[in-house]
Curated annotation (Swiss-Prot):
Intrachain disulfide bonds: C37-C51, C41-C60
Lineage, highest ranks first: Eukaryota, Metazoa, Chordata, Craniata, Vertebrata
Subcellular localization: Secreted
Keywords noted in UniProt: Antibiotic, Antimicrobial, Defensin, Disulfide bond, Secreted, Signal
Known function: Has antibacterial activity.
UniProt xrefs under InterPro entries: Beta_defensin_dom
Domain of life from the UniProt record: Eukaryota
Organism (species): Pongo pygmaeus
Similarity remark: Belongs to the beta-defensin family.
Listed Pfam families: Defensin_beta_2
Protein name as annotated: Beta-defensin 107A
Range of residues in the leader sequence: 1-22
GO biological process: defense response to bacterium; innate immune response
Length: 66
């Protein structure tokens, strides 16, 4: 019975590690697109994707003036 709880706890930890890795990867993609991760984009910015982090879900970039 103890081994069941140990395996269950290990699976929960692994799930959290993979989520963190994905969030870091998305933040790097946002940086490559010359954006930044924010909780909300400002009025003069456009949403170009998602960072999927808890505190900064949006990838924002300044609008280009034509």
């Amino acid at each position: 019975m103890k081994i069941f709880f140990f395996i269950f706890a290990a699976l929960i930890l692994l799930a959290q590690i993979f989520q963190a890795r994905t969030a870091i990867h998305r933040a790097l993609i946002c940086k490559r697109m010359e954006g930044h991760c924010e909780a909300e984009c400002l009025t003069f910015e456009v949403k170009i994707g998602g960072c999927r982090a808890e505190l900064a879900p949006f990838c924002c970039k300044n609008r280009k003036k034509h």
